[in-house]
Structures are given as structure tokens and as C-alpha cells.
């Protein structure tokens, strides 16, 4: 008799994806972040569902409903801080996952990579709208500033902004629709993640060497289920240390003041995970130019498969490209720091240099390094 997991229509899908899946024998801990992102999404959907039971998307009561969750709901403080820090954890895993993809050349799987970029945009949109919901000072002013960027679009910009606001300023209609979108988007993300996985399993996983591994595959279970479980345990240990001991470490103190349209905070800035893009936006004096640079800072990832010049897929044996990769990582960290600083010297010029370097490394230096390394192979 055939094993049930190989014949039952539902279990067969799970079996092909998580049990009998042929996996390269040499993939490292950097391949754990896919499953960790799945865990983060589950944590966010579960905690968000319980928060939505007590939250009211109304400008008069939103802030106090969040306070009520923290003070009066059983373990409400825990659910709220799990959701807030879960977003940070999500982006930490997301950026590490993307970094792994760049380092080991995983972008050569076009469909998987492009769906990953769509997932990144969806996650960023979800996180932005979620940040608006507590209706603190930074929620209100962040929503005002970021939605206002759309007014830079020629001809239709102003109408578009008012259409998104549902009025002439960020108000009750805006909060209500942001709550609706923030609720539905994670489920769309979950569906897209399934498609992401579907395309990945069409080609099979990449590996650190960046070479075909068809001759050396092992079943996903028990080898990588065990490995993923270790990653999950370590991630949860780190996560609950954050939630229980340092819940406000990554938050903004301004968001503990209720939203006040008459009082602007001294420094309007988004959450830490958007600061690098915010720094790129601010480094260009022109509004439309800034918005284009902001979008391109993420969209530039879609160009990677088309500007690869090296004969080798992975950076494992490419010292020049490795140096440029770590320079890019350092540059993104500098941009993150600059995004949180006020717009004044010397931060302005540092931000402009870092923004220029970001695009130069990806669009010019890395392809040139690939050509040089190809020549080195012949020496």
C-alpha cells in the first residue's frame, strides 16, 4: 500500500513542498530565512487578528483603544508588543533573505525573484499602514508626509492624494481605509508567498557554490526540517527577549502622544526599517526626483538578473564582488543612520554621497567587477 502522504490530494502538496522535496546537501544557515519569514507572517496575522478584536479605527478613539488593549485586555500588552516588534523582526529577516539572494546569485531564478520584490513592496505597504493605526503623533505626521509624496506625480498628483485621504487631509476616512487595507494585505502576502514557493520548487533551491546540485540532493525532511526548527527556536528566543525586556527599543517616543494636527513633531521619520529609503528620498532636493529615487531604491533589485556579467553565479569565489557587496551593506547601514538624523550639515552631504554610492555599486561597479573577474579566470 502506498503511503498516504503520497496519494492524498492535500497531503501530496505538503509532501512535495516540505517532506520529499529534493534539496541541495550543502545549503547553509542563510537558507533558513524563508521559513523564518513564514513564521513571522504567522505571528503577525495571529497577533493582528486579536488586536483587531479590540481596536477601533476612529480618529477619536483609536489612540485610547490601543491604550485600552495594553491596560485592560488580558495579555493585551503582550499581543501589542508582539505585533509591533514582530514587524521589526519581519524586516530583519526580509533584508537578510534579500542579502542572501544577492550574495549567492539567487536572482537568476527570475519568477521567484520578481515575486519576492512584489512581496517586499506589499510588506512595506502593510507596515506603513499599520504604523498609522495607533494614531499617535508620528502615525499622523508620517501618514501625512508619505501620502503627500504622491502629489509629486504630474497632473493627477493632487487629486490622487485627496482620493487616498478621502478628504482634504489625513482624517477619519484615511484611518478607516488604512485599517481595512492593513487587515487584508497580510492574507494577500500569504497567497503570494505560496506562489513564490511554487516557482522556487519549479527550479529547486540554489546553493552557496552557485552550481547545479542535481547530482547531490537530500530529502527536505528530516534534514532541513530539523535545521529550520533550530532557526525557529533561536528566532523566538531573540524575539521574546525583545518583546519582554526591550519592547520600545525600536519604537518612537513621539507615538506615545496622541495625534495633533496643530503640532508638528521636531523630526518626522518612519520606522527604522524604512530609514534607508527615506534617506535616499531626502537626498534629492527635487520632490518628483526624490520619489523616483525612493521607488528605484527597491525596484533596482529587479535589474540585478539583467546586469549580471560574471560567469559565476555566487560571490563565493569572487573577491572584488564580495568587497562591493559588503560595501553595499555598510552603505545601507549608513543610509539607515542618516534617515534618522535631522536635515542639516553634515548629514545632508553624507546622505547624498551614500545614496549615490548605493546606486553606483549596484548599477555600475558590480557589473564592472564581474567583467574583471571573468578576465581573471583566464590569467
Curated annotation (Swiss-Prot):
Family: Belongs to the cytochrome b family.
GO terms under cellular component: mitochondrial inner membrane; respiratory chain complex III
SUPFAM superfamilies, sorted: a domain/subunit of cytochrome bc1 complex (Ubiquinol-cytochrome c reductase), Transmembrane di-heme cytochromes
Keyword Lipoprotein: no
Annotated membrane topology: Multi-pass membrane protein
Pfam family, one: Cytochrome_B
Gene behind this protein: MT-CYB
Outcome of substituting residue 127 to D: In strain: Isolate LVT 2035
Sequence intervals crossing the membrane: 33-53, 77-98, 113-133, 178-198, 226-246, 288-308, 320-340, 347-367
Assembly and interaction partners: The cytochrome bc1 complex contains 11 subunits: 3 respiratory subunits (MT-CYB, CYC1 and UQCRFS1), 2 core proteins (UQCRC1 and UQCRC2) and 6 low-molecular weight proteins (UQCRH/QCR6, UQCRB/QCR7, UQCRQ/QCR8, UQCR10/QCR9, UQCR11/QCR10 and a cleavage product of UQCRFS1). This cytochrome bc1 complex then forms a dimer.
Protein's UniProt name: Cytochrome b
UniProt keyword Electron transport present: yes
Family annotation (PANTHER family): CYTOCHROME B
Cofactor(s) essential for the protein: heme b
Reported function: Component of the ubiquinol-cytochrome c reductase complex (complex III or cytochrome b-c1 complex) that is part of the mitochondrial respiratory chain. The b-c1 complex mediates electron transfer from ubiquinol to cytochrome c. Contributes to the generation of a proton gradient across the mitochondrial membrane that is then used for ATP synthesis.
A Gene Ontology BP annotation from the UniProt entry: mitochondrial electron transport, ubiquinol to cytochrome c
Subcellular location: Mitochondrion inner membrane
GO molecular function: metal ion binding; ubiquinol-cytochrome-c reductase activity
Details of cofactor binding: Binds 2 heme b groups non-covalently.
Ligand binding (a ubiquinone): 201
Higher taxonomy: Eukaryota, Metazoa, Chordata, Craniata, Vertebrata
Record PROSITE patterns: CYTB_CTER, CYTB_NTER
Phenotype for residue 295 to V: In strain: Isolate LVT 2035
Keyword terms, alphabetized: Electron transport, Heme, Iron, Membrane, Metal-binding, Mitochondrion, Mitochondrion inner membrane, Respiratory chain, Transmembrane, Transmembrane helix, Transport, Ubiquinone
UniProt-annotated binding residues for heme b b566: 97, 196
Domain of life: Eukaryota
Organism: Dipodomys agilis
Residues at which heme b b562 binds: 83, 182
Amino acid at each position: 500500500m502506498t503511503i498516504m502522504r503520497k496519494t492524498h490530494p492535500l497531503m501530496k502538496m505538503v509532501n512535495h513542498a516540505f517532506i520529499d522535496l529534493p534539496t541541495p546537501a550543502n545549503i547553509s544557515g542563510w537558507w533558513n530565512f524563508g521559513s523564518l519569514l513564514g513564521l513571522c507572517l504567522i505571528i503577525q496575522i495571529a497577533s493582528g487578528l486579536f488586536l483587531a478584536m479590540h481596536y477601533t479605527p476612529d480618529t477619536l478613539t483609536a489612540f485610547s483603544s490601543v491604550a485600552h488593549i495594553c491596560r485592560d485586555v488580558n495579555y493585551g500588552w503582550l499581543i501589542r508588543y508582539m505585533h509591533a516588534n514582530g514587524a521589526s523582526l519581519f524586516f530583519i529577516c526580509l533584508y537578510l533573505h534579500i542579502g542572501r539572494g544577492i550574495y549567492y546569485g539567487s536572482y537568476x531564478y527570475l519568477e521567484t525573484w520578481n515575486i519576492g520584490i512584489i512581496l517586499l513592496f506589499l510588506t512595506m505597504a502593510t507596515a506603513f499602514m499599520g504604523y498609522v493605526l495607533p494614531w499617535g503623533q508620528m502615525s499622523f505626521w508620517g501618514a501625512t508626509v508619505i501620502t503627500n509624496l504622491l502629489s509629486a506625480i504630474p497632473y493627477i498628483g493632487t487629486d490622487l492624494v485627496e482620493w487616498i485621504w478621502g478628504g482634504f487631509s489625513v482624517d477619519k476616512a484615511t484611518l478607516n481605509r488604512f485599517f481595512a487595507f492593513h487587515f487584508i494585505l497580510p492574507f494577500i502576502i500569504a497567497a503570494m508567498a505560496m506562489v513564490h514557493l511554487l516557482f522556487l520548487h519549479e527550479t529547486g533551491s540554489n546553493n552557496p557554490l552557485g552550481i547545479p546540485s542535481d547530482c547531490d540532493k537530500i530529502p527536505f525532511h528530516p534534514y532541513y526540517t530539523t535545521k529550520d526548527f533550530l532557526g525557529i527556536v533561536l528566532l523566538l528566543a531573540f524575539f521574546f527577549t525583545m518583546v519582554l525586556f526591550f519592547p520600545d527599543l525600536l519604537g518612537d517616543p513621539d507615538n506615545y502622544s496622541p495625534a495633533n494636527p496643530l503640532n508638528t513633531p521636531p523630526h518626522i521619520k518612519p520606522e527604522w526599517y524604512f530609514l534607508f529609503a527615506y534617506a535616499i528620498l531626502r537626498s534629492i532636493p527635487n520632490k518628483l526626483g526624490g520619489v523616483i529615487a525612493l521607488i528605484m531604491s527597491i525596484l533596482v533589485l529587479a535589474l540585478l538578473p539583467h546586469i549580471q556579467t560574471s560567469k559565476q553565479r555566487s560571490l563565493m569565489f569572487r573577491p572584488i564582488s564580495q568587497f562591493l557587496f559588503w560595501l553595499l551593506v555598510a552603505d545601507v547601514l549608513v543610509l539607515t543612520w542618516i534617515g534618522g538624523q535631522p536635515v542639516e550639515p553634515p548629514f545632508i552631504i553624507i546622505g547624498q554621497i551614500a545614496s549615490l554610492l548605493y546606486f553606483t555599486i549596484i548599477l555600475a561597479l558590480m557589473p564592472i567587477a564581474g567583467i574583471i573577474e571573468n578576465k581573471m579566470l583566464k590569467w
